[in-house]
UniProtKB/Swiss-Prot annotation:
Residues 82-93 are annotated as: Required for its function in pollen tube reception. Coiled coil: none annotated. It comes from Arabidopsis thaliana. Residues 140-165 form a propeptide. Expressed in leaves, buds, flowers and stems. Highest expression in the synergid cells of the female gametophyte. It is a lipid-anchor; GPI-anchor. Glycans are attached at N137. It is found in: Cell membrane. It comes from the Eukaryota. Keywords: Cell membrane, Fertilization, Glycoprotein, GPI-anchor, Lipoprotein, Membrane, Signal. This is GPI-anchored protein LORELEI.
Amino acid sequence: MELILLFFFLMALLVSLSSSSSISDGVFESQTSVSGRNLRHAKKKCEVNFEYMDYKVLTKRCKGPAFPAKECCSAFKEFACPYVSQINDMNSDCAQTMFSYMNIYGNYPTGLFANECRERKDGLVCPLPPLYSHNLNASTADSTPRFISLLISAATAVFALLVLT
C-alpha cells in the first residue's frame, strides 16, 4: 500500500515539475547568429504574434548608449517569460522572430541580451507562469498546459488518497 502511495506521489511530482520555467540559453543563438547559409530544417511559424506586442517594457528601461545590464535583463525577462515555452521551442521560429522585433523597436546591438543576461548555465530563470495571464490571448495561452498539469496532479493525489482509505 505504501508503495502505491509513493508511486502516485512521484507521478504527481513529475507531472507538476515538467513545465519549463526558464528561458533556454539556446534561444540566444538566433540573436547572435550572423546571416549566412543555414542547412537546418525549416521551422514552424511562431504561434505568438510578436509583431504587435507592446515593447515599451524593454524600450523604456533598456536604453543606449550604455544599455545597463541589470535593467535590460530585468526588462527582457518581464517581456519574454510569459512566452517561455514558445521561445524555448527550437522547432519554431519564435525566438528568432521575437529578437527581430526587439531589435526593430529597440535598436539593440546584436547579442546584447545573449552576452549580458546570464543567470544559470542553461539560461534565465523565469517565475512560474500564472494559471491565467491577461497578456496572452486564447491562441497563445501557455497557461492551458500548465492548468492541465495541475489538474492531473490533483487528480492523482485524490486517487492516491482514495486507494489508501
